[in-house]
């Protein structure tokens, strides 16, 4: 797979936030294996740095654990190996493609899994991405479809993530979101109405990063064009930005 498909590189403070798509490649789940549906939520509350600090304090058993903290440090590290990719990029690529993990990657997965806790509040998380999630759902080129066609195809789809996924609870701190320093190249904007049961850990504080667990349930509730444009690195022209609203639990 070309390097660009494993996510962007050079994100300051958390290269895990630069991942563009494979971390959220979703697999539709149908029939008897389908997860339970999200509960009905009337209000989603904004998440703050204070909320994050309080949740960390309430889960000191995890956040004081040296193995979890070492795995978390590796996950958000900018350091790359001989392949040119970070620890998290390689881990997520292998998880998405069902490849064997090396000892270091298995340690990361085990320790991150041990540190996962429910976010505890019905809140909204934000993510900027490329169109990998659409391609995983059978849409080869969303720019050739109307908004109505996309809604008919996608709304109501329930799926599960196959790897870890980075979000921001404060969109002003995510450099890849629209309007931010590196936001011009991401054509898919995902708004996640995360229910309190969504399991996660905190990544880079400077980017208000929340990393959700492998196997997180997602259900698409809305799809629309927001009237803005992006210029992805792998495209030769600007394309309309699409917003996908999901619920997670």
Predicted regions and their residues:
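Juxtamembrane/interface and other helix-to-disorder boundary residues
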Residues: 1-43
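Mono-ADP-ribosyltransferase
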Residues: 39-249
């Amino acid at each position: 797979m070309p390097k660009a498909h494993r996510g962007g590189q050079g994100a300051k403070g958390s290269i895990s936030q630069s991942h563009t798509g494979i971390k959220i490649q979703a697999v539709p789940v149908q029939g008897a294996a389908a997860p339970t549906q999200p509960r009905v939520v009337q209000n989603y509350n904004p998440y703050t740095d204070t909320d994050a600090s309080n949740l960390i304090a309430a889960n000191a058993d995890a956040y004081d654990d040296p193995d979890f903290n070492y795995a978390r440090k590796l996950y958000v590290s900018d350091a790359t190996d001989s392949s040119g990719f970070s620890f998290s990029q390689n881990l997520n690529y292998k998880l998405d493609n069902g490849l064997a993990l090396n000892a270091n990657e298995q340690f990361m997965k085990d320790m991150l899994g041990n540190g996962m806790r429910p976010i505890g509040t019905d809140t909204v998380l934000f993510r900027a991405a490329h169109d990998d999630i659409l391609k995983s759902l059978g849409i080869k080129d969303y720019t050739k479809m109307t908004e109505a066609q996309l809604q008919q195809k996608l709304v109501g789809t329930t799926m599960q993530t196959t790897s870890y996924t980075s979000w921001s609870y404060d969109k002003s701190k995510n450099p890849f979101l629209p309007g931010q320093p590196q936001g011009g190249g991401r054509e898919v904007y995902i708004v996640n109405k995360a229910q309190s049961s969504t399991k996660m850990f905190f990544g880079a504080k400077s980017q208000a990063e929340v990393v959700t667990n492998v196997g997180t349930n997602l259900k698409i509730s809305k799809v629309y064009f927001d009237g803005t444009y992006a210029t992805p690195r792998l495209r030769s022209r600007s394309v309309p930005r699409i917003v996908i609203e999901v619920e997670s639990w």
